[in-house]
Amino acid sequence: MNIDVLTLFPAIPRVYFSTSIMARAVSDGIIHYNIVNIRDFAHDKHKHCDAPPYGGGPGMLMRSEPLGKALDSVDAPKKRVVYVTPSGKLFEQGYARSLAQERALVLICGRYEGIDQRIIDEYVDDEVCIGNYVLSSGEIAALVLIDAVSRCVSGVIRHESLEEESFVNSLVEYPQYTRPRCFHNRDVPPVLLSGHHAHIRTWRLARQIEKTRRNRPDLLSAARASAAWTQEAESLLKELDYELPPHPTN
């Protein structure tokens, strides 16, 4: 996959691509990246990329000329341009898996109060929000998206690791434990030490349901309505003495 990142602060994404799992994916040739400094396309002496909005209002907007030229400089066939913004559609795991099928992604890192609407109208395929909050740095939001998408690209993460992560079956991940067996008088659940794989699998599914019910009841409702929800899962849910309202079909 080719990833182009358009930013006013290239040092932020550069560190990310040189660290940990992403560095290995780059080294293995699975992920190719290019960081485009939008300031390189501003031709005034001070490399200004912002201006006040027409009609008044607080803050500044990223100007269309340097950003448009930066986008034009990206030579990638069949590229998908994504702008990360609080006003976009909510970013979820299913969308991450969908983007992982693209050959080329172009990420626009916003700053100030946003970008000129004409850039969105002419260049942007998707406006995406990573959560119901506002950040000062569009780079941080873009890196969240890049990380989630890259993990779904074949070869970046082991397949079995992906299959057991949160949200794969609309449930959050089960609790996990490692050494030592006892920590501050808290023991590892005995079933995990039993070596009985079927019992361990059932325990983990029950804990997934329990944890999702507690922290993300919206996901549990969706899970029950999905084709992946099994009779075993329904039985475990009933054992937890919890009843959910029917998931809406419309």
UniProtKB/Swiss-Prot annotation:
Keyword terms: Cytoplasm, Methyltransferase, S-adenosyl-L-methionine, Transferase, tRNA processing
Claim: Lipid biosynthesis is one of the keywords in the record: no
Alphabetized Gene3D superfamilies for the sequence: 3.40.1280.10, tRNA(m1g37)methyltransferase, domain 2
Top-rank EC class of the record's enzyme: transferase
EC numbers for this chain: 2.1.1.228
Residues binding S-adenosyl-L-methionine, per UniProt: 110, 130-135
GO cellular component assignments: cytosol
Reaction equations catalysed: guanosine(37) in tRNA + S-adenosyl-L-methionine = N(1)-methylguanosine(37) in tRNA + S-adenosyl-L-homocysteine + H(+)
Cellular compartment(s): Cytoplasm
GO molecular function: tRNA (guanine(37)-N1)-methyltransferase activity
GO biological process, one term: tRNA N1-guanine methylation
Coiled-coil intervals, chain numbering: none
Record InterPro entries: Alpha/beta_knot_MTases, tRNA_m1G_MeTrfase_C_sf, tRNA_m1G_MeTrfase_TrmD, tRNA_m1G_MTases_N, tRNA_MeTrfase_TRMD/TRM10
Predominant localisation class: cytoplasm
Cited function: Specifically methylates guanosine-37 in various tRNAs.
Quaternary structure (record): Homodimer.
Designated name of the protein: tRNA (guanine-N(1)-)-methyltransferase
